[in-house]
């Protein structure tokens, strides 16, 4: 069998094994071969590469000439003006780019050639070689002179020579190549092309530009090319578009010496008719208007450049530019000088005006200004100017008698005939600016390196008044840098402008706002400029000098939308600096003397097309954005949510940052919530309180009653039901928002952060919103700081801001709500602070006791915990309804402040202390249970409590925390929340105790309120409560008796009232004592709180001063409070004591609720066990006094 099996296996494999093996071997061989092959291939490739490199090196070594052929063709931009770079090599590859640039005339960046300076030879061509440098140039200039003199421009010719030196675009070009990639020349700016026109164009171009004061416009009779004040019509046809833009009449017959360089050379030296024709290819073959339009767009600049050399009638070589692009301006026609194509612009055509010299090099860039696009008749205007020159103009285009060559060069102004221009120029002109670079393109095609516009600018800068460097190079650089392409255009424009400036003739009326002075920009003026433009030091700098005509130009279509014009003239205020990218015309922002008119277009007409990155101005946008951002919170808060005047005033600013969130969610709902239910105002709160009073009565009475009875859970349930139920209407969102955020207020309050969350949750935002709104800052500061982290949970739900603790306390006190409603109604604002605080305290004691004991004390601390657990529903509901309102109210009042204050020390402490302590102590167990529910939430509450405690402790620390938080720390921590809840519960349970304590609490509430009021600003932050505590107690006691009584009465009329009275008396005594110890502070705080009651934000105010000053003083008096009350209100007196102890603490963090519930608890951890005892709080407070958080409490 085995054999069989084996045999079978064999059979299976049978002969197959061999076959398989063979197959496998074959495969392996193949794979191995393949691998080896690959390896060999790689090796060979590598070897070949190395070999190739070696061979190349050897070959080059032996045949250096090969380098040149392989390398870019050397393009000579000869500029007698620019000794540095008479010639520059531009790789042949660059040549096509100019064409591309021409196509993308509008994209300045596209104009910039990629060639590297490396490729630019120092001087490849000898001036004679170019036929422009040296004698030829001189002769050309001489001719030009003659022409000019004939035109009355002989002196200008000399000037043009001088300017050529300064402005010589060739020079600039040659320089620029070194400066930037543009420097490599293929970038043919219309102006640059001509000026730069490879070979001779650069030198010649300057002359041309100078000579070529485009007379296109009748206005601009280009009588003085050098003047460069392109007489361009309103269109401001930059006759000096370096590319001799054929002023293509609609027909488009624009003789354009295409090769700017060649033409320029021709212009500079004897015009080279042959060259011109060749380059003239740029000229539209047919003068058809359509073509003209097309070319116009393409050549807008060119046309502008089209030097309407009417003034040089002598150069009648107008090159009629028969429709067939006769590069008519045969150089011969108008000898070297001024191919100022008058653009004879016969009424119909601007087109033909290719300077004789333009022919070859002048890339009569097709920046053919569509001058005559609409020009037949308008050109007539130009025609007059150009007409004289037009003598020989062929039919299609009036003879474009070339002006002196310089004129041609300067044709950058892409100005169509003034009249035609307005019609067609606007659109095309913008393009023409880019077409200025196209001029380069043409030259590039000829292989001439067109000096970078920036280079040109540099030269021009030299030529132009050096004043421009004064301009904020930064802005200019910013624009230039971002818009290097624009720079090219700018340079072209600048050149044109320069010509204009050089000529000082009227500015072109076209899109050129003024004449640009281009200078080498030494970016030292502006770092930004350097940043923008690495080569800033060499960057051309444009000075745009708006002329009177510029204004006219502004009205016209922008010719240089992409150009940077730096205007020194205030007129440039009209002209706005526009980054092509910036839609906004904000150049005016630049000093009027130096304004960038990037588009060189009137702001109204300017259409920023380009990248925003070019514009520093975009920062303007940013700024607006920032402004909205900074103010949006406030605006939102203010606009979205009605805010009490005080509240809005203070709270808004403070809250706004946070409030927006609150506001957004509850949107000042807290504020709104409070306000919202009743109204955004405190009065609203009062109504709300009233409503709450009803609701609080409802939920307070039921809630309290229930809360007292059901206080913990039942209370919660009832509170929930009641609170929610009655509280729902007004607290509906409050209650609801706070409901989720009920604790949310507190818990959230616990941490505004939490608050944030809970606040976000619901009311938190609401409550927190309110709190935040009013006290958002506070809340954040307080809650956040203190963060009612504990409160956070509860407060978060309920209303962190809600005054987390206070809110909680308040909030927790449905009674507080009632109280609030009552007292708030009574003391709406004041009592809101006070009442809220009081509410927090009294109500807390009362309502809290009921609603919360949890709600109340837990409200803050416990609210965090207690409220959170059972209280979340309960507090959520009750606290929410009432608490939120309360909280809201509280928050609103000093609610937040109170939160700050109360939780800090005052409300809470008072509440906590007296109320809480009694409640706490009592509640410690009961509340704990309750608080535990809450404490269940207590965990989080405990945390919250801790946090809250931190906050609340800090807040309450002195009073509440100390008493309750101290206890609450323990209690809250241990029963911590319980403590809070305890008091709540206790108030519910011990509610009577709590109530008396509530009295105390109320008192404390009052103090809390005071605290809130006072602490609102400071207390809140400082543990305003500490400060507030004394005071709050003081104030609160003062008010508390009313509010507390009312609150107590409304909340827990019987127990609450009794206890409240009792405790209030006690508290009052204590508070008075506190008040005595810090009466002025207390009063001040009280007053402040009252004043700020609506603005919980005051907590922050209180925090620094009160904590430091008030806190110590205010809290010390607390000691005098009877021990019984102290027990109930443990922190009431103990808080005061603690406050004393914490006095150092207040100093610790001024302006914050420094006492950290958690820290306090930590410090008071041992005291937590003592949390029930008032002195625990005292101890705790003292221990924490050093702690910023605790300090706050002490302060309270």
UniProtKB/Swiss-Prot annotation:
Stretches with biased composition (Polar residues): 157-177, 299-321, 733-742, 750-762, 787-804, 826-849
Localization (cell): Membrane
Primary site of residence: membrane
The keyword Hydrolase is annotated on this UniProt entry: no
Compositionally biased intervals (Basic and acidic residues): 962-971
Disulfide bonds: none
Feature: compositional bias, Low complexity: 212-227, 253-279
Membrane topology listed for this record: Single-pass membrane protein
Name the UniProt record assigns to this protein: Uncharacterized protein SPEM3
Species whose genome carries this gene: Homo sapiens
């Amino acid at each position: 069998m085995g054999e069989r099996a084996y045999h079978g296996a064999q059979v299976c494999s049978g002969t197959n094994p061999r076959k398989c093996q063979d197959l496998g071997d074959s495969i392996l061989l193949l794979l191995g071969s393949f691998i080896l092959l690959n390896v060999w291939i790689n090796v060979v490739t590598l070897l070949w590469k190395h070999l190739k490199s070696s061979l190349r090196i050897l070959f080059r070594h032996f045949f250096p000439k090969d380098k040149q052929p392989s390398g870019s063709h050397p393009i000579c931009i000869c500029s007698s003006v620019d000794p540095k770079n008479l010639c520059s090599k531009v790789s042949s590859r660059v040549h096509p780019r100019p064409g591309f640039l021409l196509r993308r005339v509008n994209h300045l960046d596209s104009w910039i050639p990629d060639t590297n300076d490396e490729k630019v030879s120092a001087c490849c061509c000898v001036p004679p070689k170019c036929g422009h440098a040296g004698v030829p140039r001189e002769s050309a200039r001489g001719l030009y002179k003659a022409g000019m003199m004939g035109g009355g421009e002989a002196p200008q010719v000399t000037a043009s020579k001088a300017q050529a030196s300064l402005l010589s675009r060739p020079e600039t070009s040659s320089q620029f190549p070194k400066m930037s990639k543009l420097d490599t020349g293929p970038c043919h700016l219309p102006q640059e092309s001509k000026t730069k026109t490879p070979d001779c164009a650069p030198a010649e171009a300057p002359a041309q530009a100078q000579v070529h004061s485009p007379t296109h416009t009748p206005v601009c009779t280009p009588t003085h090319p050098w003047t460069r004040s392109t007489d361009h019509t309103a269109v401001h046809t930059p006759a000096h578009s370096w590319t001799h833009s054929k002023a293509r009449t609609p027909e488009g017959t624009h003789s354009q010496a295409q090769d700017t360089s060649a033409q320029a050379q021709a212009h500079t030296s004897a015009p080279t008719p042959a060259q011109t024709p060749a380059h003239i290819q740029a000229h539209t073959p047919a003068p058809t208007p359509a073509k003209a339009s097309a070319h116009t767009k393409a050549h807008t600049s060119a046309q502008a450049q089209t030097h309407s050399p009417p003034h040089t009638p002598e150069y009648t070589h107008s090159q009629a530019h028969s429709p067939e692009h006769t590069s008519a301006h045969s150089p011969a026609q108008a000898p070297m000088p001024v191919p100022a194509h008058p653009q004879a612009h016969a009424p119909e055509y601007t087109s033909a005006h290719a300077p004789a010299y333009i022919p070859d090099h002048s890339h009569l860039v097709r920046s053919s200004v569509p001058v005559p696009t609409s020009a037949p008749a308008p050109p007539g205007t130009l025609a007059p100017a150009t007409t004289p020159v037009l003598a020989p103009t062929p039919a299609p285009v009036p003879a474009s008698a070339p002006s002196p060559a310089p004129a041609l060069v300067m044709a950058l102004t892409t100005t169509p005939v003034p009249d035609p221009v307005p019609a067609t120029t606007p659109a095309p002109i913008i393009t023409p600016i880019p077409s200025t670079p196209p001029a380069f393109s043409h030259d590039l095609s000829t292989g001439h390196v067109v000096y970078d516009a920036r280079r040109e600018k540099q030269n021009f800068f030299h030529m132009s008044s050096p004043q421009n460097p004064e301009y904020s190079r930064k802005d200019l650089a910013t624009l230039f840098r971002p818009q290097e392409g624009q720079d090219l255009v700018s340079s072209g424009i600048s050149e044109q402008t320069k010509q204009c400036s050089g000529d000082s003739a009227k500015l072109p009326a076209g899109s050129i706002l003024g004449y640009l002075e281009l200078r080498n920009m030494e970016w030292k003026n502006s770092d930004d400029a350097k940043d923008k433009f690495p080569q800033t030091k060499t960057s051309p700098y444009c000075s745009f000098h708006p002329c009177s005509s510029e204004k006219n130009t502004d009205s016209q279509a922008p010719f240089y939308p992409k150009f940077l014009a730096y205007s020194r003239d205030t007129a440039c205020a009209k002209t706005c600096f526009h980054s092509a990218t910036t839609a906004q015309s904000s150049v005016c922002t630049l000093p009027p003397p130096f304004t960038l008119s990037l588009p060189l277009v009137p702001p109204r007409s300017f259409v920023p097309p380009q990248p925003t990155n070019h514009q520093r101005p975009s920062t303007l946008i940013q700024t607006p954005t920032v402004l909205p951002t900074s103010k949006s919170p406030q605006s939102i808060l203010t606009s979205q949510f009605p805010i009490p005047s005080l509240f809005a005033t203070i709270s808004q600013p403070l809250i706004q940052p946070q409030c927006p969130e609150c506001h957004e969610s509850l949107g000042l709902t807290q504020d709104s919530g409070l306000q919202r239910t009743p109204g955004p105002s405190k009065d609203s709160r009062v109504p709300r309180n009233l409503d709450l009073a009803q609701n609080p009565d409802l939920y307070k009475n039921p809630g309290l009653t229930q809360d007292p009875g059901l206080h913990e859970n039942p209370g919660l349930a009832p509170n929930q039901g009641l609170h929610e139920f009655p509280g729902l209407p007004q607290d509906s969102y409050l209650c609801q928002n706070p409901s989720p955020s009920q604790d949310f207020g507190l818990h959230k309050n616990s941490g505004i952060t939490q608050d944030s969350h809970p606040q976000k949750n619901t009311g938190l935002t609401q409550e927190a919103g309110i709190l935040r709104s009013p006290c958002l800052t506070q809340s954040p500061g307080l809650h956040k700081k203190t963060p009612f982290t504990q409160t956070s949970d509860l407060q978060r739900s309920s209303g962190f801001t809600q005054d987390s603790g206070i809110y909680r306390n308040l909030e927790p006190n449905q009674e507080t709500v009632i109280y609030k409603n009552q007292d708030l109604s009574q003391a709406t604002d004041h009592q809101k602070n006070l009442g809220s605080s009081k509410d927090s305290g009294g109500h807390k004691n009362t309502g809290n006791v009921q609603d919360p004991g949890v709600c109340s004390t837990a409200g803050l601390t416990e609210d965090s915990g207690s409220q959170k657990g059972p209280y979340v529903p309960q507090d959520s509901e009750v606290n929410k309804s009432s608490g939120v309102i309360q909280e809201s109210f509280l928050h609103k009042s000093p609610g937040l402040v109170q939160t700050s204050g109360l939780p800090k020390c005052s409300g809470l402490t008072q509440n906590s202390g007296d109320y809480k302590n009694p409640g706490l102590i009592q509640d410690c167990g009961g509340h704990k249970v309750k608080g535990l529910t809450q404490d269940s939430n207590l965990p989080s509450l405990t945390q919250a409590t801790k946090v809250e405690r931190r906050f609340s402790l800090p807040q309450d620390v002195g009073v509440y925390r100390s008493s309750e938080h101290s206890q609450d720390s323990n209690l809250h921590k241990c029963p911590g929340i319980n403590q809070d809840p305890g008091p709540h519960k206790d108030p519910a349970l011990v509610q009577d105790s709590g109530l008396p304590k509530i009295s105390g609490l109320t008192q404390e509430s009052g103090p809390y309120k005071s605290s809130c009021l006072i602490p609102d600003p400071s207390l809140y932050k400082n543990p305003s409560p500490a400060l507030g505590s004394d005071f709050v107690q003081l104030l609160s006691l003062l008010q508390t008796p009313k509010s507390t009584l009312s609150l107590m009465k409304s909340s827990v009329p019987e127990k609450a009232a009794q206890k409240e009275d009792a405790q209030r008396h006690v508290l009052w005594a204590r508070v008075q004592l506190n008040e005595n110890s810090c009466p002025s502070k207390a009063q001040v705080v009280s007053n402040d709180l009252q004043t700020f009651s609506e603005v919980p934000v005051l907590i922050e105010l209180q925090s620094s001063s009160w904590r430091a000053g008030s806190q110590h003083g205010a809290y010390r008096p607390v000691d005098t409070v009877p021990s019984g009350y102290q027990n109930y209100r443990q922190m009431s007196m103990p808080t005061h004591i603690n406050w004393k102890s914490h006095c150092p603490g207040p100093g610790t963090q001024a302006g914050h609720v420094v006492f950290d519930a958690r820290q306090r608890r930590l410090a008071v951890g041992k005291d937590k066990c003592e949390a029930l005892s008032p002195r625990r709080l005292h101890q705790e407070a003292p221990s924490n006094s050093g702690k910023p958080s605790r300090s706050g409490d002490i302060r309270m």
